[in-house]
A protein has these predicted regions:
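An N-terminal, globular interaction/scaffold subdomain
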Residues: 5-35
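Extracellular/lumenal glycan-associated surfaces
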Residues: 24-37, 140-153, 247-257
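A contiguous, surface-oriented mixed alpha/beta subdomain in the mid-to-C-terminal portion of proteins
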Residues: 64-220
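C-terminal functional regions that serve as terminal interaction/effector modules
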Residues: 212-260
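Structured, contiguous alpha/beta core segments that scaffold functional sites
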Residues: 25, 33-82, 100
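Single conserved hydrophobic/aromatic residue that forms the stacking wall/gate
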Residues: 1-7, 11, 259-262
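Short, recurring structural edge motifs at helix starts
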Residues: 12-20, 128-136, 232-241
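Extended intrinsically disordered, low-complexity coil regions enriched in Ser, Thr, Gly, Ala
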Residues: 32-56, 151-169, 256-260
Length: 262
């Protein structure tokens, strides 16, 4: 009974990592739909199955028509002070929001919370392995952002810099700054090739996010197979399941898009 209870506690703690991720995606979806005024589509896509695990009322969020109503829907959660700070610093103009600033603040809250939990609830090697899982995801998200902004928007360094998550795994801050400041996509990829990710990401790829997903998948699978920590193994398992779901969604979206454009 003691072992069973301990295992249950581990699963409950690690499952919260996934729940928080989904909650933030819902809040960001709500903000995007306020900007684009597509509330009906948002309501239809709500994952109501997760309501028993969520820290706020999902349907309440679905009814939000303004930033104030989003904040009201998440009142009493860790997201409320984050959104209020953004609202004060970047006040909305009607339905117009500085979306990337809100996204950065929420994702920073997410990764900071995960790192604090890992430090508080694990020790030694298990803590280091959880930190690797968490910070690598943030770092690869930064690389994806740099690639997209340079490739599709020809964004300058200042515009990219303010979107960077403040977490590092295998890169040094100086290396990330050099890639942010690279003059174009090719210069960015050349700098990336000199980093620990260089041997794992094909610079000729036509699908950069697929390459970074592969890096994350292999690192996560390695910890799933070889870690001796229940917390790490379960977190790795949940993250792999999440990645598989993301892949399925991408395939469905690609097929739907192809069908619509034929």
């Amino acid at each position: 009974p003691i072992k069973s209870s301990a295992a249950s506690d581990v699963y409950k703690r690690q499952y919260q990592y996934i729940v928080m991720d989904l909650e933030i995606e819902l809040i960001l979806s709500s903000l995007r739909n306020i900007i684009s005024d597509e509330q009906e589509d948002f309501v239809a896509s709500l994952p109501t199955f997760m309501q028993p695990y969520a820290s706020f009322n999902i349907l309440g969020l679905a009814g939000a028509r303004s930033l104030d109503e989003v904040i009201e829907a998440v009142a009493g959660t860790a997201y409320e002070p984050v959104l209020r700070r953004c609202q004060k610093q970047y006040p909305p103009d009607g339905n117009t929001l500085r979306y990337t600033r809100y996204e950065l603040a929420l994702r920073t809250c997410y990764f900071s919370t995960l790192l604090e939990r890992a430090k508080r609830e694990t020790r030694g090697r298990a803590s280091a392995e959880l930190r690797e899982l968490i910070t690598m995801r943030a770092e690869l998200m930064n690389l994806n952002t740099i690639y997209r902004m340079k490739t599709y928007f020809q964004a300058d360094a200042d515009r990219i810099r303010v979107t960077m998550l403040p977490f590092y795994s295998r890169l040094r801050p100086r290396q990330l700054e050099e890639m942010v400041s690279a003059r174009d996509t090719q210069a960015f990829l050349k700098l990336l090739s000199a980093t620990p990710y260089g041997r794992r990401i094909d610079p000729e790829t036509g699908f950069f996010e697929g390459e970074t997903d592969g890096v994350r998948y292999r690192a996560t699978r390695r910890l799933l197979r070889f870690s001796t920590s229940p917390e790490v193994v379960y977190t790795a398992f949940m993250l792999l399941r999440s990645m598989e779901t993301e892949d399925i969604v991408r395939i469905i979206e690609a097929v739907s898009y192809t069908h619509l454009t034929l």
